[in-house]
């Protein structure tokens, strides 16, 4: 099969722009590329991807606002769950540990949608979440993360997940057994903020009655009611200006 250099793309985690020659064609490195529906940038910040998600979700919130007066409450709720929050449910494990700035953008869209649904323009975001009996997008993504870890635990995860989250074999059993291997890291963005590093810590926060489940469906039902507390990621940590994360 003859190669088509026009379809070649080069993405490097490097500040400098590089060029390579293939079949006398020059391929320049790009700042971001879309792969399987996820826009990956050279800094692995996923800012481009999340901004695109926010733009699409915001457009649908605007459409909902225009038509809200013509819809019933159930119809407005259906629009939220089917066409707005679903934008943030595709491949969340890849991009979920993004910046606080991006998390605020997502929450702002979610908050505005809830205000339109409940016609409530006085309550706080947390009060709206309580009224809706729903978590934030980030909290829902944390639920999905621990669900994937549970699949690994019971042997129902795809092989690639077993490569990312390696099982730690122990000669004895502990009540709070850590079955996902913890890695030593040296950096923040590609180390302590990586999903492979944070996953075991987040698993520790899961209630014991959920961990002790043996059935995936039963685990999913229980984990829906779990609101993560004291999550160790940068999004959830308290930040004090001129001091840093606490």
Regions found by a protein language model. Name each.
Residues 2, 44-53, 68-78, 96-106, ...:
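Conserved, non-catalytic sequence blocks in retroelement Pol enzymes and Pol-derived host proteins
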Residues 22, 159-198:
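Amphipathic alpha-helical
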Residues 2-32:
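Short, conserved micro-motifs composed of acidic
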């Amino acid at each position: 099969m003859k190669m088509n250099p026009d379809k070649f793309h080069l993405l490097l985690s490097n500040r400098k722009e590089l060029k390579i020659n293939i079949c006398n064609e020059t391929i320049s490195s790009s700042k971001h590329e879309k792969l399987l529906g996820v826009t990956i940038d050279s800094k692995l910040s996923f800012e481009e991807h999340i901004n695109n998600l926010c733009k699409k979700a915001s457009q649908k919130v605007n459409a909902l606002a225009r038509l809200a007066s013509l819809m019933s409450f159930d119809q407005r709720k259906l629009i939220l769950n089917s066409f707005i929050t679903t934008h943030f449910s595709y491949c969340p494990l890849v991009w979920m540990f993004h910046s606080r700035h991006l998390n605020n953008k997502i929450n702002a869209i979610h908050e505005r949608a809830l205000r339109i649904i409940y016609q409530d323009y006085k309550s706080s975001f947390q009060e709206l979440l309580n009224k809706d009996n729903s978590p934030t997008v980030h909290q829902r993504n944390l639920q999905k993360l621990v669900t994937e870890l549970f699949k690994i635990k019971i042997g129902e995860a795809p092989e690639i997940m077993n490569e990312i989250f390696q099982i730690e074999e122990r000669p004895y059993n502990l009540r709070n057994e850590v079955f996902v291997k913890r890695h030593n890291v040296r950096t923040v963005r590609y180390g302590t903020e990586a999903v492979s590093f944070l996953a075991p810590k987040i698993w520790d926060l899961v209630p014991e009655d959920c961990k002790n489940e043996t059935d995936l469906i039963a685990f999913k039902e229980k984990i829906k009611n779990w609101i993560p507390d004291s999550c160790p990621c940068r999004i959830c940590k308290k930040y004090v200006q001129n001091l840093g994360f606490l």
